[in-house]
Each structure stands twice: as C-alpha cells, then as structure tokens.
Amino acid sequence: MKKPINTVAPDAKIGKNVRIWNYAYVGSKTVIGDNVKIGSLAHVDYDVRIGSGTKIEGSAYIPPMSRIGKNVFIGPAAVLTNDPYPPSRRMIGVTIEDGAVIGARAVIKAGVRVGRRAVVAMGSVVTRDVPAGMVVMGVPARVAYTRKEFDVKMKEWESGS
C-alpha cells in the first residue's frame, strides 16, 4: 500500500494510531490525540487541539485556534470559521466539546462553543453557542430536540424500523 500523500507540519504533535488520509493538511503547533482519523482533503490549520477518538471527514476545514474535544464527529465539508468579520486581523477559533456531532456541510461561526454531546444537523449555519445535549438545525440553527431523542432516532434508523 502506498503511503498517503499529505502535509503535516514538522512541529505538529500526532498521537498514536492516528490516520491522516490523502491530501490532508495539518498545521504548525497542532496537537492531535490518539486514535484520530482525518479524511482526505481536510484542512486542520495551525494551533488546533483535537482530542482522542475524534473523526474528521474529508474536505472539512478546522481553523487556527480551534479546540475539538474527545470522540467528536465532524462530517464531510463542514466548515468552522475563525473570523466573524473577514478579513479582520483578530481571529478566534471554535470550541467543540466531547462527544459532539457536526453534520456534513455545517458552518460554525468563529467563537462559537458547541456543547458536550450536542449535535449540529447537516447544512446548518451555527451563529450562537449550542447547549450541551441539544440538537440544532436550520439557517440560522435553532434547537430542534435533545440528544437523547437523536440517539433514539439513530437506533431506529440503524435497526431499519
């Protein structure tokens, strides 16, 4: 098997059993925990922290200074931003707490905190903090239901009911 073609800054700290797929980028001073997967064409910029067990799908963008917790899922082409008023000289990352789920093509505004085990539905635009254990969806994203309800729906889907 050929070694994946990607770019990882020499001063990035990469944990054990990390898989970085083809054409992904990991920036300077980024720290990645154990058992993390980063999909093809994903861009993880400089000074990012990613907790163990997190999965970042292809074409996702994680901006500088973002903090991603443990066991987070970030769907394909999700975009976290770092400048609410571009092009500003002041930047701030996004914080995603442990166990959160970010759906495909979701966009999260700079400085937003996504709470523990919260879910951002695919295609949503998040402009405010997301409370822990809640599911948000829409443009702009609003609370739709709880993570507990989401987990029930997922189990029903997986069982084919």
Cite the ranges covered by each PLM segment.
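Leucine-rich solenoid repeat scaffolds
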Residues: 125-127
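ABC ATPase nucleotide-binding domains
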Residues: 158-161
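Flexible, glycine/small-residue-enriched loop-and-beta-strand segment within the central core
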Residues: 1-5, 9-10, 20-114, 139-140, ...
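Short conserved catalytic/interaction loops centered on acidic-Pro-aromatic/His motifs
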Residues: 115-117, 133
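Conserved beta-strand-loop-alpha-helix hinge in the C-terminal portion
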Residues: 132-156
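Binuclear metal-ion centers of metallo-dependent hydrolases, dominated by the metallo-beta-lactamase
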Residues: 120
